[in-house]
Amino acid sequence: MPNSLQKSFKQTSDLTLALGWAQERLGDLSGPGMFVSEANAERFIEAFVTDDSFSFTMDSGFIYGHAYGPNPHIDPRWEKCAVAYNNFGPKFGHLEIANQFDTYGISTKVIPGFETIEELTDEVLIKKILDENAPTSSTYPGNPEILQWGCVRNESGDISAIGALVRWSSGAYVISSVATVESQRGKGFATELTKRFISRANQLGAETLGLGVSHKNIAAIKAYQKAGMSEIAQFTNYLKPGFQSK
């Protein structure tokens, strides 16, 4: 288990320096840049770097951490932490293991044949499709970060898959709440939807587009990979005992 006493670390409350550290160790398309940036700098608290690892702390309505590398500094303030490529077992410092999710991303471009996406504005219909086909979706109508809902249809004209294009407070563009109607699964509609959102994000000026998906959702991961998205990181969420998101 990592222990901040085992290795010396540097820390900073300077966001620009912190993102520089992240880029040096993790590359341009990385988790930290999706969650914190100059656009939501007021949420950034502190970052920590060791010889081989990086971690940071931010305010998400609770004290939220991210940790990357084999020996990251653990901030004792963390109530929840996402650990990349976790090998730490059931406990991570004072936190306990909860669940796993993966992040994917792509440099946007307009994809020939997928230049447009149909906008969906019927919020009652959107909620119905989510409730019936993806009830654990993180984004529902009314979320202020939504830029638009989009859909694709089958040959009969029926809606087959929906999703939301979202811009987080960090400025990151993200696809959220992708739901394929159960009878239409396995036919490539989620891949088509993703390609159309990649084009749309490019048209809106986004350089990159990301998404999060449950580590167990193999079918969805394959759909995103077929659309050209690459894995950024596999995360394990750790929670402070008794923690409940506000």
Segments the model singles out, each with a brief description of its role:
Residues 1-89, 127-129:
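N-terminal charged segments
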Residues 52, 206-208:
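Short, high-confidence coil segments that cap the C-terminus of an alpha-helix
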Residues 95-107, 230-245:
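Conserved catalytic-core motifs of GNAT/GCN5-like acyltransferases
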Residues 138-149, 153-156, 160-181:
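A conserved beta-strand-loop-helix scaffold within acyl/acetyltransferase catalytic domains
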